[in-house]
Amino acid sequence: MMRSHYCGQLNESLEGQEITLCGWVHRRRDHGGVIFLDIRDRDGLAQVVFDPDRAESFAAADRVRSEYVVKITGKVRLRPAGATNANMASGMIEVLGYELEVLNESETPPFPLNEFSDVGEETRLRYRFLDLRRPEMAEKLRLRSRMTTSIRRYLDENGFLDVETPILTRATPEGARDYLVPSRTHAGSFFALPQSPQLFKQLLMVAGFDRYYQIAKCFRDEDLRADRQPEFTQIDIETSFLDEKDIMGLTEGMIRNLFKEVLDLEFGEFPHMTFEEAMRRYGSDKPDLRNPLELVDVADQLKEVDFKVFSGPANDPKCRIAALRVPGGASMPRKQIDDYTKFVGIYGAKGLAYIKVNERAAGVEGLQSPIVKNIPEANLNVILDRVGAVDGDIVFFGADKAKIVSEALGALRIKLGHDLKLLTCEWAPMWVVDFPMFEENDDGSFSALHHPFTAPKCSPEELEANPAGALSRAYDMVLNGTELGGGSIRIHRKEMQQAVFRLLGINEAEQEEKFGFLLDALKYGAPPHGGLAFGLDRLVMLMTGAQSIREVIAFPKTQSAADVMTQAPGVVDAKALRELHIRLRETPKAE
C-alpha cells in the first residue's frame, strides 16, 4: 500500500513513529524558512513540516502548490506548546517530513477549496469532483455512508432480507410523471423507471419473503424544489403479518438507533397525532412541533357579525376561520405585517386580518386593528381568551376555504417560528396517523391521498358507500416539519383492491391492463402486509444540517433536472433514434 495511515488517524499515540501519507495539498505556508503543508485526504487534515536541513524534501515542498497530489513520509511529533489546533482531529501533532513525492500536479482550481467562498451552485456542480474535495462536503458523504451502514445493520439484525427489484418496469399511475425508456426490441413500447418499488415489494410479500428492505433508486419526472430530485434514494421496507403498531415500532426503533449511532442523540418515544388534529392545530399534515404557535378555530364567534369577510366563511361548512397568536408580536411594524400578508397570498389567501393586543384591560380601546369595530366586544373577548392573548401579542386571522386557511396560516406559522426564533428544541420527531383514504377533486372525483394500494379502515361496502369519510391505515413519520417517511398497511384482498380502483375511476379493463399482475397475485393467498419508505436524501439533509438535498448527493441534478458536469440530458444521434423506432418532430414556431 502507498500509505500507512489516513490523515485523520494521526494522534499523540503515534508520536515518534514513521508514517506515510497520501493526499492533496490543502494549504501551503512558508514561515521563516520553514514550509508547512496541510495534507488532506478523505479522513481529514494533517500538518507536515519541512525544514531546510533536508534539502531535497524542502526543495520539493517549495515547488508544490494547492491540490497537488503527494506522497509524504515523515515522523510524528507533538506540536510545540501553543501551536495545537483544536479544529483538526490531528491538531495535537504534526509530521516532520523526510520525503515528498509529487504523484500529480494540478491546475489552479476554479474556486478555492481551502476556505469558505461564495461560489455559485452551477459552478460547484460543473466541477463537482472538486467541490467534493472540500472537507465539509466530504463529511456529508461520510456521514451518509455511516447512516446506510447503520440502517442495513439494524434491518439485517431484525430479520430483513435485502432484495433488489427491477429498474426497467412499466408505467403505473402513481401521481408524478414517469421517466420513459423506449424499447428497441418492442417497437412503440416503453419501459418506465420506477417511482418506487411499491408493487414489487408487495409481490415479494405474496411470494413469502416476510421481511424485505432495499436502499432503492427511484425516479420521478416532476417539478423540482429544495427537497426534490429527478432521481433519489429510498429506504424501502415491507413486512408481512405485522399491523400498523408493529411496523411503526420497528421503524421508529431504526430511526432512534440511527440517531444514537451517528449523532449520539437519544430520542424518547415518538408522539402520535391524527391527520385531523395536525391540520386543525398546525395547518399541516407534517407539523414542526419545535414551533409553539398553534392555529385556533374561532368561526363560532363570527357567524353573526356584520362583516361578510368573516360571516360568510363562518357559515360555510367548507370554510374555516382560524386565529394564530404570536407572543410579543404587537411591536411588529406595518411593513412586516404587509410582508406577511403578501406571503400568505402565495397560498391563495386574499388577505391577513390582525389584532394587536396593546392593553386587554382597556377593552376595545386597548386593541389596535381595522376589524375590531366589526366584532362585538363579548365575541372579541372569547376569541382572545381562546387563543391565550395577553398584552403585547398580535393575533392573525385567516378566513376562506378550509384548505386555503390551513395551508396559508400553517405556512405563516412556520415562517414566524423561524423569523422570530421561536423554536423550542432542536429535534421533534412524531407520527401522523388516520389519514383520509381519498381527497376529493373539484369535479367530484377522488384521488388516493397516499397511493391506490393503501388499505382503508372499513369494508369494501362501507368504503363505496362513503368514500369521502373513509380513513386509511396509513402513517407518516415527521421530523422538524419534514416528512421522513410514509407507509401503510396494504390491501391484500382482490375485492377491496378492485373497490378502490373503481372509486378512483379506473374501470375493469384499465385495471386488468395496468394492474392485472397484482390482482392475479392477490388471488393466491396474499398475506396481510404493510411497509414504509424513507427518503434517504432528505434524512441525510436533516442530520447534516444541509440546506438542500443537492448538498448530500454526490452528483445531483440542478433544479432544471440537468447535470451541468456531464451535460446530461444530451442529444442522441439519428442512428440510435432509428434503432429505437423514434422520430423527432420540430415544434412549429408561433406566428
From Swiss-Prot:
Location(s) in or outside the cell: Cytoplasm
Residues annotated as site: Important for tRNA non-discrimination: H31, G82
Residue segments, region Aspartate: 198-201
Any one GO BP annotation for this protein: aspartyl-tRNA aminoacylation
GO terms for MF: aspartate-tRNA ligase activity; aspartate-tRNA(Asn) ligase activity; ATP binding; nucleic acid binding
Record key words, sorted: Aminoacyl-tRNA synthetase, ATP-binding, Cytoplasm, Ligase, Nucleotide-binding, Protein biosynthesis
E.C. numbers: 6.1.1.23
Record-linked InterPro entries: Aa-tRNA-synt_II, aa-tRNA-synth_II, aa-tRNA-synth_II/BPL/LPL, Asp-tRNA-ligase_1, Asp-tRNA-ligase_1_N, Asp/Asn-tRNA-synth_IIb, AspRS_core, GAD-like_sf
Catalytic reaction equation(s): tRNA(Asx) + L-aspartate + ATP = L-aspartyl-tRNA(Asx) + AMP + diphosphate
Primary location group: cytoplasm
GO cellular component, one term: cytoplasm
Binding locations of ATP: R220, D221, E222, Q229, E483, G535, L536, D537, R538
Matching Pfam families: GAD, tRNA-synt_2, tRNA_anti-codon
Residues holding L-aspartate: E174, R220, H450, R490
Function, as annotated: Aspartyl-tRNA synthetase with relaxed tRNA specificity since it is able to aspartylate not only its cognate tRNA(Asp) but also tRNA(Asn). Reaction proceeds in two steps: L-aspartate is first activated by ATP to form Asp-AMP and then transferred to the acceptor end of tRNA(Asp/Asn).
Family of this protein: Belongs to the class-II aminoacyl-tRNA synthetase family. Type 1 subfamily.
Subunit field text: Homodimer.
Protein name according to UniProt: Aspartate--tRNA(Asp/Asn) ligase
Taxonomic classification: Bacteria, Pseudomonadati, Pseudomonadota, Gammaproteobacteria, Pseudomonadales
